[in-house]
Amino acid sequence: MDAIDFVKKNTEEIVTMDEAFKALNNNPKGYIGFEPSGNPHLGTCLLLANKINDMVNAGIKMTVLLADWHAMVNDKLNGDLNEIRKSGELFKRAWLAAGLNSNVKFVWASELVEKSDYWSLLLKVAKNASLLRIRRSLPIMGRSEEDADRDFSKYIYPLMQVTDIFYLDVDFALGGMDQRHAHMLARDIAERMNIKKPVSVHTPLLSSLKGSGRMDSFKKMSKSEPDSAIFMTDSNDDIKRKIKNAYCPMKEVNGNPVIDILKYIIFPYYNDKISIKRPESKGGPVDVDMDSLTRMYISGEIHPVDLKNAVGELLCDIIGPVREKLTGD
């Protein structure tokens, strides 16, 4: 694969592709900011580690910013920095156990905010941002304007995220689609400040195992809803139970969390080839890649029960070694 193919792999959007091509030719640096909180799940551990590795394989020097101060501002773990840092250390162990490239650098936000030039840069960023634009960026932290009006520190959060990007001097800003507002804000402010704009690489978010109701908007895996996500500490029985109960409509791949897990977690792990057991009356075992699986599922050749059985077993194989390193079980 070419470098750009690694960057594009399993992404929702790249802003912009032309800038990405150019940046890849100049010893690029990249970063992803992460708020430590709770326990690692498929999305915050495996999907994230896979995508960071893609960026490393593209020749990008990647940094993970463990955003402890951001998590404190966002009231994660009751704003307790000690607990937030414990969570950050847990995520570091989980990512490395999941195969994160050992050359990836970890930096704590607390290391940055101790430096006076960080805050002078933040003020320059603020001078080039309007209150209206900051308000529009609040969804990056899952907050509303009303939340920020009650706690002004939340207006500082988007400014910190932009400052992180500039302070680390990165060419690529990686994040889920929920971080798009912050990355677009950084690009706009960079243009006003006449400095390089970060290429924004956005990944999909893993949907809740429960799916979304007909009138509901997208729901992602959430640590606050244990049955909506597969956690790295889940037992094999829990993994299989959650997958068995997961939303998986017959012949539908869009909005199907089981299909998403296959696409973003399982196929990358198994080099795009797995085997699915079916009753002999339904054709027997079949080897598939993502394209053939999609066709066969839509046509009804693969039943949801057989799909779930395969996904449950494969996830147990993937998560088992990670769980053992985290818990000893």
UniProtKB/Swiss-Prot annotation:
Catalytic activities: tRNA(Tyr) + L-tyrosine + ATP = L-tyrosyl-tRNA(Tyr) + AMP + diphosphate + H(+)
Residue ranges of the motif 'KMSKS' region: 220-224
Location in or out of the cell: Cytoplasm
Keyword Nucleotide-binding assigned: yes
PANTHER family (UniProt xref): TYROSINE--TRNA LIGASE, CYTOPLASMIC (PTHR46264:SF4), TYROSINE-TRNA LIGASE (PTHR46264)
HAMAP family linked to this entry: Tyr_tRNA_synth_type4
Annotated protein name in UniProt: Tyrosine--tRNA ligase
Annotated gene: tyrS
